[in-house]
Design a protein with these regions (language model features):
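A structural detector for beta-sheet-dominated domains
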Residues: 9-11, 46, 57-59, 89-91
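Short, surface-exposed beta-strand/loop "edge" segments at domain boundaries and coil↔beta transitions
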Residues: 14-17, 62-68, 94-101
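Acidic, proline/glycine-rich low-complexity IDRs
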Residues: 95-133
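Short, extreme N-terminal segment that most often corresponds to the first beta-strand
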Residues: 1-29
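Short, intrinsically disordered low-complexity segments
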Residues: 29-75, 79-84
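Beta-strand-enriched cores of mature, soluble protein domains
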Residues: 4, 41-45, 89
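A short amphipathic beta-strand at an alpha->beta junction
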Residues: 83-96
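Ampiphathic alpha-helical segments that act as solvent-exposed interaction surfaces
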Residues: 24-25, 69-85, 122-133
Length: 133
């Protein structure tokens, strides 16, 4: 089983927007729209109080390329719209190395940082008991 939870607040820059030409802001917005329009994961930009964001949940019996593609989309957007911030949590119990751990992808200031989560991991016994036959 794979479980992916992700969110990304989309912000054009982490720098002072007053010093960035409007044309540059619009170019960033267009690039983000292009990424979303051309993704194969059915991601779409949502808005709350005028702020664009992504909110993603995937729960599948087996890992597919979808999780990797979602991480790639979040990464591309955060590299272009460098003020974007958010995270993705992934638990893939078929992953040979991390089957018992949540893996996190943290997005901030145009970077994606990968870490093994310590809040829910190891998943057994932190969030589930071991099954005994």
């Amino acid at each position: 089983m794979i479980e992916l939870h992700g969110w990304l607040s989309i912000v054009e820059t982490y720098k002072n927007e007053d010093f960035i030409p409007q044309e540059e802001i619009e170019k960033i917005q267009e690039q983000v729209k292009f990424i979303i329009q051309n993704n194969t994961c059915d991601l779409e930009i949502l808005y709350q109080n005028g702020t664009p964001f992504l909110n993603t949940l995937v729960c599948c019996n087996h890992n597919t390329t979808q999780a990797k593609q979602i991480i790639e989309v979040y990464t591309k957007i955060s590299e272009i719209a460098t003020g974007s911030y958010g995270m993705i949590y992934v638990w893939d119990d078929e992953d040979k190395n991390y089957y018992n751990h949540f893996q996190t992808y943290i997005f901030k200031k145009g970077q994606c940082e990968y870490k093994i989560d310590t809040n829910f991991s190891p998943c057994i016994p932190t969030i589930e008991d071991a099954f005994i036959d």
